[in-house]
């Protein structure tokens, strides 16, 4: 899908024509459509009927193949868990990988070494690039250092700083700006999203995240925020109430809550949770800035392990006990 806020960055890339570098790293915040921008560029590079500086025509054979996911000169590299065409090995219980594995990169090495099918460029799209494991990243680096002619690597990363510096240095970085609030609101209105302003605020201005919040998400968020805003906060009872809630959601919501506490303490404003602005203001007034910043940094650090807690119940209890400790520091 193409998004209206991509018009300018896509046109700028297409205007470079043959001067486009062999490797681009699309980086930036999650939920603004970096992957869609990279896909639009891939379609344009492989289109056989477009004029210079124009987008893919959408009608030629190459465009039809891209629509069907079968273009012979295009490869998508992503973790098994994201692959729509994943075919589990017969007779195995192996879970789909969260990483891009070295075997996948080796397959790409064979692909780019072959003669092109359509006498045009080859395109490799890697998403999310930060999911490359160490061995896969090292194997990819060899391809980036000595790329075959007319081969384009398009890497997309939310947490680009997790990529090895050697890979980042081989790519020209593309940092698409998020849409303006007005543009995001207009787009969300066309998606028939209820309470678009709250969703957009909670998504930090990222419209694709805003539209992804479903009823179950809002219900679980409400359970969490009601629990932590009780006059007498009970961490263990709150953990029990959220026993079926994904730890990643709890950490994300708490991180946004803590960010709002810090923001209100410094600026008097609330970003992610405008529907709880009064409670945030009252809580921030009671807490010290140093303690709030320390707690926020702790939550940010938990993002690295939240996907695989050894014991979910204990993880939630510890998480909420730490918030209770923050409240006890109230001045």
Residue ranges and their predicted role:
Residues 113, 138-152:
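Conserved catalytic/switch belt of AAA+ P-loop NTPases
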Residues 119-123, 148-154:
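Loop/turn-to-beta-strand initiation segments
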Residues 72, 116, 147-148, 179:
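Proline-centered helix-kink/hinge sites
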Residues 1-135:
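Clamp-loader machinery-focused feature within the broader ASCE/P-loop NTPase space
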Residues 26, 126, 140-141, 157:
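Hydrophobic residues in beta-strands of the RecA-like P-loop NTPase core, especially within AAA+ ATPase
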Residues 68, 146, 193:
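Arginine/glycine-rich "motif VI" loop of SF2 helicases in the C-terminal RecA-like domain
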């Amino acid at each position: 899908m193409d998004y209206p806020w991509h018009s300018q960055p896509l046109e700028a890339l297409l205007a470079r024509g043959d001067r486009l570098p062999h490797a681009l790293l699309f980086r930036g915040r999650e939920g603004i459509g970096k992957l869609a921008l990279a896909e639009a560029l891939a379609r344009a590079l492989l289109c056989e009927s477009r004029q210079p500086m124009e987008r893919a025509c959408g009608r030629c054979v190459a465009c039809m193949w891209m629509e069907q996911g079968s273009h012979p000169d295009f490869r998508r590299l992503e973790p098994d868990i994201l692959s729509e065409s994943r075919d589990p090995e017969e007779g195995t219980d192996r879970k789909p990988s969260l990483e891009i594995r070295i075997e996948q990169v080796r397959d790409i090495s064979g692909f780019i070494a072959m003669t092109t099918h359509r006498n045009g460029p080859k395109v490799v799209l890697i998403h999310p690039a930060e999911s490359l494991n160490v061995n896969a990243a090292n194997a990819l680096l060899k391809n980036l250092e000595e790329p075959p002619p007319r081969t384009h690597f398009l890497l997309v990363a939310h947490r680009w700083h997790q990529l090895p510096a050697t890979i980042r240095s081989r790519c020209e970085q593309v940092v698409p700006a998020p849409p303006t609030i007005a543009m995001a609101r207009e787009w969300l209105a066309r998606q028939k999203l209820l309470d678009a302003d709250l969703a957009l605020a909670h998504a930090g201005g990222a419209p694709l995240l805003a539209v992804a919040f479903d009823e179950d998400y809002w219900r679980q968020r409400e359970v969490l925020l009601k629990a932590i805003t009780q006059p007498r906060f009970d961490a263990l009872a709150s953990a029990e109430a959220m026993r079926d809630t994904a730890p990643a959601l709890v950490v994300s919501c708490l991180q946004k809550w803590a960010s709002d506490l810090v923001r209100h303490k410094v600026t008097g404003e609330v970003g992610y949770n405008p529907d709880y602005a009064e409670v945030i203001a009252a809580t921030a007034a009671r807490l010290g800035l140093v303690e709030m910043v320390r707690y926020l940094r702790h939550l940010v650090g938990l993002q690295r392990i939240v996907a695989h807690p050894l014991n979910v119940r204990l993880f939630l209890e510890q998480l909420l006990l730490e918030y209770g400790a923050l409240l006890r520091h109230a001045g």
